[in-house]
Amino acid sequence: MKLVLLERVENLGVIGDVVSVRPGFARNFLLPQGKALRATEANMARFEVERELLEKRNAERAAEAAESGKTIDGESFVMIRQAGESGQLYGSVTSRDIAEIVSESGTKVVRSQIALNAPIKTLGLHELKIKLHADVSVTVTINIARSQDEAERQAAGEDVIAAQADEDRAIADAQAAELFEASEEGQELAAQREATEDAGADESEETEA
């Protein structure tokens, strides 16, 4: 399907370009969001008449997006989630979740603006882009942790999963050492008992003799 773009679309073209796209992409995204028109003679004539106005409006929207983006660009947002010891989440964090928490900061963001290829399923710091406008993107960090304390440790650069694994190994080593010591003590006591019993038996034999 041939369309004329009304704004820049990433990996497709800029305002005024006539492009060929799949019908589904046109009907489900470009046309309903007002990013393009069907490239008919009537629409092309209409576009040329309104081109200057469209370009001015697009520049204004880009400026507004850039201004609002200053409040979140480079910021970190904490999300507390349940997860196993391996760091795997019980569930996932989606673009909708991210849009909601970022919007709480005062900058309105919708899920379609979140550049996320797949839901996030692990703890940690996840850097991603938010496309506030075709010409304006900002970068944020999503800090997913099991507690506020863990989030602060991650923000400070600590690998909490590796730290937890080290702690678990240290505990396991300590428990193994305790068991080994207990086993050695048990063997010593058994040896002492055996020696005592042998000595008693020798004394008994001497008495009988």
UniProtKB/Swiss-Prot annotation:
The keyword Ribosomal protein applies. Coiled coil: none annotated. Residues 197-209 have a biased composition (Acidic residues). Keywords: Ribonucleoprotein, Ribosomal protein, RNA-binding, rRNA-binding. GO terms for cellular component: ribonucleoprotein complex; ribosome. Pfam families: Ribosomal_L9_C (PF03948), Ribosomal_L9_N (PF01281). One of its GO terms (biological process) is translation. Residues 181-209 are annotated as: Disordered. GO terms for molecular function: rRNA binding; structural constituent of ribosome. Belongs to the bacterial ribosomal protein bL9 family. Binds to the 23S rRNA. This is Large ribosomal subunit protein bL9. The lineage of its organism: Bacteria, Pseudomonadati, Pseudomonadota, Alphaproteobacteria, Maricaulales. The gene is rplI.
